[in-house]
Each structure stands twice: as structure tokens, then as C-alpha cells.
From Swiss-Prot:
This is Probable feruloyl esterase B-1. Its EC number is 3.1.1.73. Residues 1-18 form the signal peptide. Keywords: Calcium, Carbohydrate metabolism, Disulfide bond, Glycoprotein, Hydrolase, Metal-binding, Polysaccharide degradation, Secreted, Serine esterase, Signal, Xylan degradation. The active site is at residues 203, 417, 457. Ca(2+) binds at residues 272, 275, 277, 279, 281. Homodimer. Disulfide bonds join 41-90, 76-129, 202-458, 271-288, 297-308, 517-539.
């Protein structure tokens, strides 16, 4: 099978993996070794002729060395998290001018174990930073891989201030430009060009993947989009609203971190067993409608104990678990799903502004560096929605062009996401179904959505959340354990995933696995084995 022909250099520490690497390569790819590949790389700079581009460097990177982060500014982490190359590749760094007031920085990593496949990575937050870990992950599988800084360096919105060109890069242009340039470099470097084009991204990267599906359907054959920051304008308004609910730490409405722990424990008490198993994980938060009043302090209790809430605090918590509405009661954004309270505190409930919302309103909506999130109202949300620069909301429900060209989307979202409510993904799925007048079985031909229980924002948390979405979540090379390989199998072999199998990792050790259902089905424990037995669950 084509999927099993993908090379696995990052597993080369085992003899079995090393043997597999030596004995396999994509029949559509090219396997370069030693000095010939190095010579091809070192002579490639003179052959690059990309419009509006300034090539900084073309460097041969051998296997087994720390990859230089000289082009990664300190605002993006610099070299604090070095990556060791487990494969040889040709590294190209360049700037591409997108307007008289904007440019992107990008890199292309062209591996010696090329599989005949192209892949673009995405970004995160308001960034701003090349996702080098994702580039290493994809290039390790033999993809010619590109990544950009999304039009500016840094994970904040300062660069947007009075510069709509940088906003345009962030909305869509940086990724699309990187794809166009990256494909040109790939075709020029490898005589056979590329056969299929893929995308892998989460959060802002998830939104970027969906923007490509909606606006540039020919860019990719397969898109893996996690925890998308789509409905972007209303997402920022949702993030701004939390401070108006909680107040600062001195407000009577403020709920302390200790009290949020009590809230979380009560939610788990009420909702954990709704899926049939008491495992500390809420499989489907849709079923969880917590009665927070159960935590009201009685006559002998004090809210200062951290174990109970005042009436004002209960109102705050209920507000968090309520949808956000705008002028005239118009729906803006769904509630925060219950189960994510512990991680969400630092981002949303701590009595301080959510930085991304603050930056978007300051530097884009109002162009006022002194704007105060505490003053946010639904009128502000209406102003932001009326702008929606370059349709950054990324909410088009008509995916017909992508469907007709044969594209595939694998969409996933963690059910404990503390940054982007997982309910937003469910709302979008239904929006696509309604817009295209397609049932779930009809959507299945090109669009499949997998809610991942026990996953926080893009990765990790309490449950079996490692699904091969990146280096730190690698849990196997079977397509059912790896969303990137599942996408390759779907595109190239026509075998679509009916489930995504996640792993609960302890370091690199798999503690247990669970099959995550394809929406709109949900997982239910039916026994008779332990909840750690994947065969004790079924999709209903």
C-alpha cells in the first residue's frame, strides 16, 4: 500500500524501522543519497527564479545534526527548542514580497527521501512563526514541505496596526503564496515534480486549511485541519466577552482558580458517566448540561473556602457555558464546552484580557492601541463583523468547488479544547450540510469530522488524544492511528477513515487506545472490558 511506503526516518532508532527505511520508498518519489543529493542542493540556488523573491540561503542539512534556527527570531522562540534532523534535506529560506508594504518569510525543506508529495504547514494564534516542528514531521515522511511566517514575525497583532496588507497576508495570502512558491521550488528541484498536495495545520492552522478549501480549492488534494479558528471574528468577540463576565480578580463575579477546580470536579461528577464509563473524560460534551447551582454555598459555608460559589459566581459560570449573542439576539459563537475549565482559566477566566482578542480589536477593528477589552459590548462585535477583512471569518459553507475537484478534508477537534470551543466545529459541520443540502453520508465522500475526546487545544489533555497530528503526538504508522497517513490513504487509495484511533501516551509509551467516532455518531462504553479496552466502546 502506498501509505506504508512512506519513509519513517524519525523512528530510525530501532533496527526494524531502520530496515524498513532502507527497503522502502514511494514508487512515485525519488531517493537521493550522499554526495549527489548534497551537490544538487548546493547548486540549486543559482537555478531559483521566483518572482518577487529574495533567496537568503540554500543549505544542505545532513541527518543527525541540530537544525539551525538562525532565521527564527527570538519573538518566535529563536533556538530554544532545537530540532535534530533525522533525515537529509535541502533547506531553502527566502522572502517573498506580497505588496509594497508586506512580505512573507518562508522555508522549503526538500528531503532526500522524497515521496512525490507536497505539503504545506500552517501557523498558530496571531502568528507569525514558522512551525518548524510540523515541517520536520512532514518532511520526515518524505513530503516536500513548506512553512511561512504568515506575513509577520511574532505571535501578536502589533504588525496589523494601520497595515491592511499584513492583515491580508494573515487572512489568506501568506499561506497561498507559500504554496504557489513551494510548488514551483518542488517542481524545479525534483525532475518528476509532485503527484499530490497536502496540508496539515491546527488552530489558526486549521482555519488556514479551511480557507484554502473554501477559496483556493486547487491548492490541495487533502487537508487535515484541527481545532479551526474559523468564524474568526466572532471567535475574537467570544474571547473578549469573558472579561466582561468574570470581571477582574476583585469583582464579586470573579471565580478563583481554586473554585474553577471545584466547578470542574462537579462537572465530571455530573457528566462523566453519561457515556457509560467513569474515566474522567466526557466523550460528548453535547450531553453535558451541568447544574452549577449544586455548588451554591449553604449557610455554613464561605466562598473563600474555594469549594462553593456565591450566586454572582454561579451566574458567571453559567455565562461561560452559554452561547454568545449579538445585536437583536443574533447568534455569534457557541458556549465553551464543559470539561475544559482547568486549562481555560489562564486564558479566559483569570480576570485579565485574552491577548488575541485584545490585539485584534486594538490593531485591526479600531486602530486604537489604548482600546480596553473591559469595555467590549455586542455593538463592538457588530462593528468587527461588518469589517471581516478579506473574509477572514472563513465561514463559507459551500464547498462545491473543492468537492468537484476530488479534494478531501479530515477535520478534528479536541473535546477539551480550552482555547477554541469544540462546539464551533459542530456548528460549522451542520452549516456545510445545510448550505450544500447534503446528509452526513453524502458529506462523507469528501468531508469527515472527528471529535476527539480527551484532547485539549490541538493535542494532549486527559485522554487518548495522540492521533499522529505532529511529532509529539506520534502513536504509530497505521493510517487508523495517524491522521496524516489516513489522509494520504484516502486521497491516493480511496480508503476513507471511518474512525480515528487515538492513543493515551506516557512519554512515548502507549497506555491505551480508543477509536474516536466520525461525527455525528458518538462514542459509548458498552463493556465488558475496562474503559481502556478499545473494543469496549462503540459508535452510536
Amino acid at each position: 500500500m502506498l501509505v506504508m511506503q512512506l519513509l519513517l526516518p524519525f523512528l530510525a532508532s530501532t533496527a526494524a524501522a531502520a530496515a524498513a527505511i532502507d527497503s522502502t520508498s514511494s514508487s512515485n518519489g525519488s531517493d537521493h543519497h550522499g554526495s549527489s543529493f548534497q551537490a544538487e542542493c548546493e547548486s540549486f540556488k543559482a537555478k531559483i527564479n521566483v518572482t518577487n523573491a529574495n533567496v537568503h540561503s540554500v543549505t544542505y542539512v545532513p541527518a543527525g545534526v541540530n537544525i539551525s534556527m538562525a532565521d527564527n527570531p527570538s519573538i518566535c522562540g529563536g533556538d530554544e527548542d532545537p530540532i535534530t534532523s533525522t533525515f537529509a534535506f535541502c533547506r531553502i529560506a527566502l522572502n517573498v514580497t506580497t505588496s509594497s508594504k508586506s512580505q512573507i518569510f518562508m522555508e522549503a525543506w526538500l528531503p532526500s527521501n522524497y515521496s512525490g508529495r507536497f505539503l504545506s504547514t500552517g501557523n498558530g494564534g496571531l502568528g507569525g512563526c514558522v512551525k518548524y516542528d510540523d515541517m520536520a514531521y512532514a518532511a520526515g515522511y518524505g513530503f516536500a514541505t513548506v512553512g511561512t511566517n504568515n506575513g509577520h514575525f511574532g505571535n501578536n497583532g502589533v504588525s496589523f496596526y494601520q497595515n491592511t496588507e499584513v492583515v491580508e497576508d494573515f487572512a489568506y495570502r501568506a499561506l497561498h503564496t507559500g504554496v504557489v512558491v513551494g510548488k514551483e521550488l518542488t517542481k524545479n528541484f525534483y525532475p518528476q515534480g509532485y503527484n499530490k498536495s497536502y496540508y496539515l495545520g491546527c488552530s489558526t492552522g486549521g482555519r488556514q486549511g479551511w480557507k484554502s478549501v473554501q477559496t483556493f480549492p486547487d491548492d490541495f488534494d487533502g487537508v487535515v485541519a484541527g481545532a479551526p479558528a474559523f468564524n474568526f471574528i466572532n471567535l475574537t468577540s467570544w474571547g473578549a466577552r469573558f472579561l466582561t463576565l468574570t470581571g477582574d480578580s476583585s469583582a464579586e463575579t470573579f471565580v478563583t482558580e481554586t473554585q474553577w477546580t471545584a466547578v470542574h470536579n462537579e462537572i465530571i461528577r455530573q457528566c462523566d458517566s453519561l457515556d457509560g464509563a467513569k474515566d474522567g473524560i466526557i466523550e460528548d460534551p453535547d450531553l453535558c448540561q451541568p447544574i452549577i447551582e449544586a455548588l451554591l454555598c449553604n449557610a455554613t459555608q464561605s466562598s473563600t473556602s474555594g469549594t462553593c460559589l456565591t450566586g454572582a459566581q454561579v451566574k458567571t459560570v453559567n455565562g461561560v457555558f452559554s452561547a454568545t449573542y449579538g445585536l437583536n439576539g443574533s447568534f455569534l459563537y457557541p458556549r465553551m464546552q464543559p470539561g475544559s475549565e482547568l486549562a481555560a482559566y489562564s486564558s479566559y477566566y483569570s480576570g485579565t484580557p485574552f491577548a488575541y482578542a485584545e490585539d485584534w480589536y486594538r490593531y485591526v477593528v479600531f486602530n486604537n492601541t489604548n482600546w480596553d477589552v473591559a469595555t467590549w459590548t455586542v455593538q463592538d462585535a457588530a462593528i468587527a463583523n461588518a469589517q471581516d477583512p478579506y473574509q477572514i471569518s472563513t465561514w463559507n459553507g459551500d464547498l462545491s468547488p473543492f468537492q468537484k475537484k476530488g479534494g478531501k478534508v479530515l477535520h478534528y477537534h479536541g473535546m477539551e479544547d480550552a482555547i477554541i470551543s469544540s462546539e464551533s466545529s459542530k456548528v460549522y459541520y451542520k452549516h456545510v450540510a445545510d448550505t450544500m443540502n447534503l446528509s452526513p453520508s453524502e458529506l462523507d465522500s469528501f468531508y469527515r469530522f472527528f471529535p476527539i475526546s480527551g484532547m485539549a487545544h490541538c493535542a494532549n489533555a486527559d485522554g487518548p488524544s495522540a492521533i499522529g497530528q505532529g511529532t509529539g503526538t506520534f502513536a504509530g504508522n497505521n493510517p487508523q492511528d495517524n491522521v496524516l497517513l489516513a489522509m494520504v490513504q484516502w486521497v491516493e487509495e480511496g480508503v476513507a477513515p471511518d474512525f480515528v484511533r487515538g492513543a493515551k501516551l506516557n512519554g512515548s509509551t502507549v497506555e491505551y487506545r480508543r477509536k474516536h467516532c466520525k461525527y455525528p455518531k458518538r462514542n459509548r462504553y458498552v463493556g465488558p472490558g475496562s474503559y481502556t479496552d478499545e473494543n469496549a466502546w462503540e459508535c452510536v
